[in-house]
Every structure is written in structure tokens, then in C-alpha cells.
């Protein structure tokens, strides 16, 4: 019985190591460049998104993008004193992509999350910055993915 268990464990370890898992968005070699034409809205969100686009420079197929971002922070719930307990953060990005002067994609992406208030305001601000960074990175990945789907045709 012990020998069979050892063989099963070795088999599963071998199977796990030989899978060669790679995240799709991190290792894919995109065959296009993405250049920013116009940006407006929240500077922090735009800079995070544009930094992801900078990895796509130098390819022969070139697309041009216009971005407009907006951040909204709402109070969802208050305690009996009127202090906020739960916040909602909404990031909205409108974008359009052009190739050879022709608009080929026009889209809107919304991402939102809720989180609890933190009594330490410095810690709350750091947490909000982390949330903004994560949501903006997710939005930039969605934009890149939508263009890569178009590029495969």
C-alpha cells in the first residue's frame, strides 16, 4: 500500500512540474504597437494604463488610442454617527482605437469595488492607491486583449 502511495505522489509531482503553465497576458508576444494619441481624465489611472502600453512599442502594426478616464468614490454605508463605513470606488475608461486614421474600436470599460473604511487615514490612502493600481492594470489588460483579438484576424 505504501509503495502505491509513493508512486501516486511521484506521478502527481511529475505531472505538475511538466505542465509549463504560463499566464496569457504576461508572456504573449503581441505583434502590434500601441501609441497614445490623446488622454484626458484622471492622471494616475492614465499613467498606469500608458505604462502597460509602453511594453508594446516597436512592432510593425501600429494602432493609436484615445483614452478618457474617470474615478468616482462613493460612500455606500455610514454608521450611527454619520461616519463612512463602506466605500465604493468606480473607474470608468472610454477609449477608441484607430488604425490608418480609421476608428476600429470604440469601447467603455467600468470596474468597481467596495471596501471598508480604515481608521488610519494614511493606511486607507495606501489601500485606495493599491485598489486603483489593480483596477487600472485590469483595464489596460482588457484593452490590450481586445486589440490582440482584432489583430489576429
Predicted features along the sequence, with ranges:
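C-terminal motif of bacterial Sec signal peptides marking the signal peptidase cleavage site
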Residues: 15-18
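Surface-exposed short loop/turn segments
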Residues: 50-51, 56-106, 113-133, 137, ...
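Post-signal peptide N-terminal segment of mature Sec-exported envelope proteins
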Residues: 28-48
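Bacterial signal peptide processing site
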Residues: 20-22
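Sec-dependent signal peptide recognition
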Residues: 3-10
Amino acid at each position: 500500500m505504501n509503495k502505491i502511495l509513493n508512486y501516486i505522489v511521484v506521478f502527481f509531482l511529475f505531472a505538475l512540474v511538466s505542465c509549463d503553465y504560463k499566464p496569457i497576458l504576461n508572456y504573449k508576444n503581441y505583434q502590434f504597437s500601441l501609441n497614445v494619441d490623446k488622454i484626458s481624465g484622471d492622471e494616475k489611472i492614465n499613467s498606469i494604463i500608458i505604462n502597460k502600453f509602453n511594453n508594446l512599442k516597436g512592432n510593425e502594426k501600429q494602432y493609436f488610442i484615445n483614452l478618457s478616464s474617470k474615478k468616482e468614490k462613493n460612500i455606500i454605508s455610514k454608521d450611527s454617527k454619520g461616519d463612512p463605513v463602506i466605500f465604493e470606488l468606480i473607474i470608468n475608461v472610454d477609449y477608441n482605437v484607430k488604425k490608418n486614421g480609421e476608428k476600429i474600436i470604440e469601447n467603455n470599460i467600468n470596474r468597481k469595488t467596495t471596501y471598508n473604511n480604515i481608521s488610519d487615514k494614511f493606511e486607507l490612502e495606501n489601500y485606495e492607491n493599491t485598489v486603483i493600481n489593480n483596477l487600472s492594470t485590469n483595464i489596460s489588460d482588457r484593452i490590450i486583449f481586445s486589440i490582440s483579438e482584432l489583430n489576429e484576424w
